[in-house]
C-alpha cells in the first residue's frame, strides 16, 4: 500500500478545506454532503454521540450558527492507498482565550460519489 500519494493527498486536503469553510460558515448543505449518507456513519462530538447520517444531519440543522469560527493548527492528513484517509487537526476559538484546545479526527473514504467522512471525533481539553 502506498501512503500519501500526492494526487490523493491533494484531493483529501481540498475536501478537508471545503469542510472547514462549510463549518465556520454553517453551510449545512455542504456539511451534509461531506458526511456519508449511511446508518453506519458516526460522529462523536463534544457533548453528543451521533449514530447514523440522519442523527448527524439533525444535529447540524438544530445547531446555533453563532460561535463557529475557529482556527486550525497542526493539521495532519494521511492517505492510505487511493481510497482511505485520516484527517487530524487541533482547533482554537477566540472565546477560549488560550485556555482550551479542540481536537478533531475524521476518517475519509472515497466512494463513487466522492470523498466522504465515515467517522469523526471532536473533543476539547484544557490547554497546558
Task: For the regions a language model picked out, list residue spans one by one.
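Short beta-strand edge/turn micro-motifs at domain boundaries
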Residues: 101-128
Amino acid at each position: 500500500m502506498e501512503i500519501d500519494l500526492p494526487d490523493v493527498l491533494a484531493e483529501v486536503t481540498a475536501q478537508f478545506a471545503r469542510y472547514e469553510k462549510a463549518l465556520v460558515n454553517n453551510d449545512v448543505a455542504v456539511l451534509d454532503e461531506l458526511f456519508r449518507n449511511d446508518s453506519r456513519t458516526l460522529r462523536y462530538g463534544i457533548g453528543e454521540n451521533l449514530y447514523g447520517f440522519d442523527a448527524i444531519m439533525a444535529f447540524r440543522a438544530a445547531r446555533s450558527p453563532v460561535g463557529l469560527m475557529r482556527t486550525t493548527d497542526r493539521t495532519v492528513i494521511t492517505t492510505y492507498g487511493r481510497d482511505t484517509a485520516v484527517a487530524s487537526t487541533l482547533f482554537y476559538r477566540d472565546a477560549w482565550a488560550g485556555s482550551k484546545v479542540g481536537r478533531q479526527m475524521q476518517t475519509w473514504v472515497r466512494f463513487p460519489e466522492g470523498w466522504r467522512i465515515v467517522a469523526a471525533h471532536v473533543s476539547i481539553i484544557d490547554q497546558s
